[in-house]
Amino acid sequence: SENVRASLLAYKMDTPVGPWRGPYSNVHAFSSQCFIHELATAAGRDHLDFLLEMFGNPRWLKPDDIRSLNTERAVGVIKRAAKEGNWGKPMGVREGQGLAFYFCHAAHVAELAEVSVDSANRVTLRKVTVVADVGPIINMSGAVSQIQGAVIDGYSAMVSQKITMENGVIAETNLDSYPVLRIDAAPEVDVFFIESDYAPTGLGEPALPPLAPAVANAIFSATGRRIRKMPLSELGYSV
């Protein structure tokens, strides 16, 4: 079949909850972008070529809504990320690159991650190249900081952040049990913008969703092991 139907269910909880940075986009990006990489691998295709081919001809997915996904803008950030991150360069043993794209909050963002994984499953995220098309940039230093922060935030969540419930109460009460990434594990983050003439979009959240699938795809390239759930600490990985 060429058609897929997806649905969401709103579930009422008795425990107070709040929004996560990027909300549902984080879950969708991780599952969809990792699966696209699996499809490319199964087809024996280069992930970059496979991803670009999916977008087809330049167009707005919703022609009457200029804040919808634009395939030309998507292709633009993906190609730029591949170029700036040197996609396909020779990598050493247990080293790999991973690519991911996601569209949310009217922003198009692509990320390329470089990792190494030692024999004890210690992951080193060496570098993340981020390219975003969010329209005109008014405050460049602020924009760069937003993306750098999103990468660190996203990697923190991917590595070790988990919420557990015990008798209706959240067990993690402070940063000792819900840790944020330390500076010695923080990657180099290269940020680039395609400054189009389209209306400015949000920037506080869009760079977070592509991070986890980019890193997961890089780990597979380095080790041959798929990452299908998070956090990595639950799978025997450390940083």
Predicted regions and their residues:
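Cofactor-binding beta-sheet edge motifs in enzyme active sites
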Residues: 1-239
